[in-house]
């Protein structure tokens, strides 16, 4: 049975990262430190700009976040690729939430624009993705537009974020 709530707290996101939310072998979020949000505040199957689904998530920013120490020394800024990855994570989560099977992978995007930075003095990052299309076949494909705001100012815009869910083909690596 899939968990179909309309919001998720941090512990729920960790459960998703362990493969416990959508079933073994299905969509998972990465675990920390690559999990790029603290909560999903809203998820719907029919909302958003295109009426095909919507996800909103938040990250509480503080100067102790791992990436500020290394990117860059004496000039800390959240790498733009991490904000982009958060939006891909949200599209993959949505696909698992609506019933898609198999592990997820980011497949690309059409366009990305940065007009600001996430710095240590920012309090909160809000991520938003609006689903444009979900293709349901052997490969589940989600396409969405998204944005990131830092303290209520939109500073990233992404168009045509693409994430696919694939039937498991790779063998697990023995540890």
UniProtKB/Swiss-Prot annotation:
Lineage top rank: taxon: Bacteria
The enzyme's E.C. designation: 4.2.1.59, 5.3.3.14
Catalytic activity: a (3R)-hydroxyacyl-[ACP] = a (2E)-enoyl-[ACP] + H2O; (3R)-hydroxydecanoyl-[ACP] = (2E)-decenoyl-[ACP] + H2O; (2E)-decenoyl-[ACP] = (3Z)-decenoyl-[ACP]
Coiled-coil regions, chain positions: none
Intracellular or extracellular location(s): Cytoplasm
Predominant cellular place of this UniProt entry's protein: cytoplasm
GO molecular function annotation: (3R)-hydroxyacyl-[acyl-carrier-protein] dehydratase activity; trans-2-decenoyl-acyl-carrier-protein isomerase activity
Keyword entries, A-Z: Cytoplasm, Fatty acid biosynthesis, Fatty acid metabolism, Isomerase, Lipid biosynthesis, Lipid metabolism, Lyase
Active site per the UniProt annotation: 71
InterPro entries reported in the protein's UniProt record: FabA, FabA_FabZ, HotDog_dom_sf
GO biological process terms held by the UniProt record: unsaturated fatty acid biosynthetic process
Pathway assigned to this chain's UniProt record: Lipid metabolism; fatty acid biosynthesis
CDD domains the UniProt entry points to: FabA (cd01287)
Record's GO cellular component terms: cytoplasm
Family: Belongs to the thioester dehydratase family. FabA subfamily.
Cited function: Necessary for the introduction of cis unsaturation into fatty acids. Catalyzes the dehydration of (3R)-3-hydroxydecanoyl-ACP to E-(2)-decenoyl-ACP and then its isomerization to Z-(3)-decenoyl-ACP. Can catalyze the dehydratase reaction for beta-hydroxyacyl-ACPs with saturated chain lengths up to 16:0, being most active on intermediate chain length.
Known partners and oligomeric status: Homodimer.
Protein name: 3-hydroxydecanoyl-[acyl-carrier-protein] dehydratase
Source organism of the structure: Rhodopseudomonas palustris (strain TIE-1)
GN (gene name): fabA
